[in-house]
């Protein structure tokens, strides 16, 4: 068996936060810092998944 690490043959991915090349250890980010920035944005509600504004009926 071949124990060498295989390098990806496709285009290099970039970090969605800063645009630097992503690394495997923190994929798809370039560093733990960018990964934490992204998590913080999700937790603060900065990212929103679009949906419909349905009216909610009050159940009494």
UniProtKB/Swiss-Prot annotation:
Cofactor note: Binds 1 zinc ion.
Coiled-coil parts of chain: none
Keywords: Metal-binding, Zinc
GO biological process: regulation of DNA-templated transcription
Binding site for Zn(2+): 15, 18, 30, 34
Signal sequence range: none
A Pfam family this chain is assigned to: YacG
UniProt cofactor(s): Zn(2+)
Similarity comment text for this entry: Belongs to the DNA gyrase inhibitor YacG family.
Listed PANTHER family: DNA GYRASE INHIBITOR YACG
Subunit structure: Interacts with GyrB.
Protein name per UniProt: DNA gyrase inhibitor YacG
Native species: Bradyrhizobium diazoefficiens (strain JCM 10833 / BCRC 13528 / IAM 13628 / NBRC 14792 / USDA 110)
């Amino acid at each position: 068996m071949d124990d060498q690490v295989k390098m990806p043959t496709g285009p290099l991915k970039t970090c969605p936060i800063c645009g630097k090349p992503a690394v495997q250890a923190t994929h798809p980010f370039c560093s733990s810092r960018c990964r934490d920035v992204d998590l913080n944005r999700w937790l603060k509600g900065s990212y929103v998944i679009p949906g419909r504004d349905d009216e909610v009926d009050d159940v009494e």
